[in-house]
């Protein structure tokens, strides 16, 4: 699993697989789920990610347990200014 954040667009992306994306499904205005050709979740895109501190219900997302663990793990990582 890989976690990336684009500060310019305020987008968090959690990669569960390196398989190419076959289709994307917009869950709501903040979440997009990407699937590979087999229908397996490849990743989850969180738009306006910094607004998540106000509370975000991810319970309806596929693999929400994995997403929760990834975000918790990311909070433990040191951040260095360039």
Predicted regions, residues:
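Small, basic N-terminal interaction modules of short regulatory proteins
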Residues: 1-82
